[in-house]
Regions:
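Alpha-helical linker/hinge and terminal dimerization helices associated
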Residues: 42-43, 64-86
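Short helix-boundary/capping micro-motifs
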Residues: 11-26
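Short alpha-helical elements of helix-turn-helix
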Residues: 1-15, 33, 62-65, 69
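Alpha-helical residues within the helix-turn-helix
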Residues: 23-24, 41, 62
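Helix-turn-helix DNA-binding elements, focusing on the entry/boundary residues of the two helices
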Residues: 17-18, 36, 50
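A short LG(V/I)-centered, amphipathic sequence patch enriched
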Residues: 40-57
């Protein structure tokens, strides 16, 4: 499961449309549809129902939203921690070289 797939799902919910979410994220509508299908297959549940009027959450999709948000938030924390660790390494290396 890829982060971008989860982000697409959340964007589709926010926009109320797979085509709108695809456009906002720079995907073709076909690619957006494939992303959702792949995510549903990986999770083993149908997340959304589609109709000419838009999309609607399934019960399974609704139950997974808190976990998806938590996972995306945790990944963001990891990214920040990694950047901070890299910055610390750079500062340490510069200080060590300056004392030599």
């Amino acid at each position: 499961m890829e982060t971008r797939d989860l982000q697409f799902f959340i964007k589709a919910l926010a926009s109320g449309s797979l085509s709108r979410a695809s456009e906002e994220l720079g995907y073709s509508v076909s690619a957006g549809s494939h992303i959702l299908e792949r995510l549903e297959k990986q999770l083993g549940v149908k997340l959304l129902t589609r109709s000419p009027r838009g999309i609607a959450l399934t019960e399974a999709g609704e139950s997974l939203i808190p976990e998806i948000h938590a996972l995306l938030a945790q990944e963001e924390k990891l990214d920040v921690a990694a950047l901070e660790a890299a910055a610390w390494e750079t500062r340490f290396a510069v200080t060590a070289d300056a004392q030599a």
